[in-house]
Amino acid sequence: MIVERIWTGNAYRNYNYLIACPETGEALAIDPLDHEKCLNTARVKGWQITQILNTHEHHDHTGGNAAVVAATGAKVIAHHKAAGKIAGMDRGVQAGDVIKVGKHIELECLDTPGHTMCHICLRSHTDEPALFSGDTLFNAGAGNVHNGGDVNALYATFVEQLARLP
């Protein structure tokens, strides 16, 4: 599994991610707000973005979807309850579902409500453990609950799921 972290350099201070299979060159774009940087990085690396995963429905995570889909034909994946909130969603996922990238990469979906009630994190099923946490968890703390979230749900996500991860 190759992970390319892309700094957006915007006021939101977001990171976008490309997860690529080294064997096939297929890539998953996670929250590709800065579609130009995501598309350019994939092109330079020789990867084909085939899927987009939105961790939740906020615009700073979904705003680049249309441009990436137009350029690549990628399928949009998000929480199953976000179907009416994320335009062009092709696949709804829930806890335990697996997103496959290329031949061997498997990312398990965790239903992690709190920041929003349609939030998911991805847990890597490779030799390199990783958690792609969207706005649930930051290096300096937890995500906020200001725009459609719930503090009790966020607390439960931390206690019942994230704290138990290896």
Residue ranges of model-derived segments:
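Metallo-beta-lactamase
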Residues: 98, 116-166
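Short, flexible coil/turn micro-motifs enriched in small/turn-prone residues
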Residues: 20, 58, 91, 109, ...
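Short glycine-enriched loop/turn motifs at secondary-structure junctions
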Residues: 22-24, 85, 138-139
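Short secondary-structure boundary/capping segments
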Residues: 8-9, 20, 66, 83, ...
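Conserved beta-strand hairpin/beta-sheet module of binuclear metal-dependent hydrolase folds
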Residues: 1-47, 122-134
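Active-site HxH/HxHxD metal-binding segment of metal-dependent hydrolases
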Residues: 12-13, 27, 33-111
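Glycine-rich, flexible loop/turn motifs
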Residues: 2, 15, 89, 95, ...
